[in-house]
Amino acid sequence: MTRETLIIGGTVLALVLGGRGAKAQGRTPAVAAFTSSVDMVRIAAVVRDRKGRFVQDLTARDFEVLDGGQTQPITDLQRDVAGVSVAVLFDVSGSMEGHLPNAREAATHVLSWLDLSRDEAAIFTFDTHLDERTPFTIGLRVLPESIAHVVPFGATSLHDAIAQTARRVGEREGRRRAVIVLTDGADNASSLKPDEASAIASSIDVPVYIFGIVPSIDNPSADTSTRSIEVAAFTGPLADLATWTGGHVFVASTPGQRSIAARQIIAELRHQHLIAFESSGKPGWHPLVVRARSRDLTVRARSGYIAGQSRPTAHQEDHHVP
């Protein structure tokens, strides 16, 4: 098991923090400082019809890509690629006390929908540190024994953990990649804001799925007011974080909801269209809009990328705790 600090900033990751705030308010996610150029941009896009059904038999002519408001020609579109690669990220901070059994159940559902022959998963946990419990493994079906014995403790660096895990998943080239976060939505120790974490994940095209673990509304012992506060944690900035990356938020309070959400996440990854186009070349953050030419279809994809800044320099690597 490896453990990494979740201090992201200064000499550890050297972030240049740009505009903050929600995309919906006309502001852009913060930008991380990187050095090498980006020539080809790849986008994972999920398409649905008006009934919410997946649409997968599209060609490049069926899409339109706007890079900074300018239409860009699509140079490649693929649907048949290698398997799924997911990082399952457990929140094991103090606020998750009482929630971990449900989080473990949700993770087991996720693993059950993977293809044993080609899909891979890795298991991570975090409080104020990120721990790798299981490296990326094809055919993973069972959670590591250590997850069953974790005692929730400490503060929560949710946004930092998401950004750092996304970078790990980003190394899994040629796969349908995602971070799946099992959390109650609390964050009281991150150095990154939600939009800053989202910018890092979005820039490397790793969708983030937030799997909200909350008390069951059917549980008569659940405090209704407390539950309302916990559900509210998954709206606003945290929902923006997921949406900007092309992911989604699922709030699951029952075993049935957790099973359905897990199945939907993996199904979305399997139905991605992988679109490629040439970057316009201007350094910095590029807002992206990917849409279908048919008004009967809706597309979900990441909100942008960083041109001229695709890879961290050597002094920007994550710090490993001895």
Spans of features found by a protein language model:
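Bacterial N-terminal signal peptides
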Residues: 9-18
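N-terminal export leaders
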Residues: 3-7
